[in-house]
Amino acid sequence: MDFLTDWLTNWLKELLIGGIMGNLEGLTDYVNAQVGEIAVQVGTTPAAWNAGVFSLIRQLSETVILPIAGLVLTFVATYELIQMLLEKNNMHEFDVANIYKWMFKTACAILILSNTFNIVMAVFDVSQSVITQAGGLIQGSTDITPDMMTELETSLEGMDLGPLLGLWLQSSIIGVTMWALGIVIFVLVYGRMLEIYLLTSLAPIPMATLAHREVGQTGQNYLRSLFAVGFQGMLILVCVAIYAVLVQGIVTSGDPIGAIWGIVGYTVLLCFMLFKTGGIAQRIFGAH
């Protein structure tokens, strides 16, 4: 009778250990996959992300918004010329050199406006290059290896049947948290790209104000916003990398129950921080 009881207990322990390891291995595989996937998604340029949407945005920008921006530039340049002519005692002390300065300034403004789309894409090319380089370093340093899981399995084998059953039930909760994390990452990554497309579609209008002394702040703030949303991808990647390192430390801590709830806590923290990356990026670049 004791032999049968021991056999049944060992069989149940092996079953529960297998279930717990399956849940946690699925988690670690998911974490590794997410770091790699996010590195790809946030490191993708608008042109490469979706060619159809990119083509539509470019056509709208160049055929609908650019003519309006041309009118804005005309008004801004004319207004600045009138101001320049009147500010020197109603032209009594006017310097002819100012006309050449105005002509040069206006020519630069026209050049910038006609190359608006290339300038905007250059911003995202720079951020994409940085994110791609960082993604390779981060992904390589946060992989959760099979050796780490073997250490965890060894600690599980020393536990009794009751704690193992409770741990298996708790580990099942991880699937729900990972599902929620996947939704948050999807919304954030895809929402960021849609924001990039929206910013790009109206780019000529703020760029038309860059050369003016008084309203040039609009164009400067627009450029800051572009850099902020571009490098937001870097902050997203860093958040996920920190999460992966923290999970890596939990898995190898030797405390399976603490690992389960630690992962849940870190997942909630990650979701919270991911939504703050946009605001942090704007503060870094002074955009508002």
Locations of the language-model features?
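Elongated alpha-helical scaffolds
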Residues: 102-105
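Gly/Ser-rich, low-complexity
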Residues: 1-72, 88-97, 107-177, 216, ...
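Hydrophobic alpha-helical transmembrane segments
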Residues: 67-79, 196
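Membrane-embedded alpha-helices of multi-pass transport/permease systems
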Residues: 75, 120, 127, 184-187, ...
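Alpha-helical transmembrane segments of helical membrane proteins, especially in multi-pass transport
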Residues: 174, 178-210, 224-246
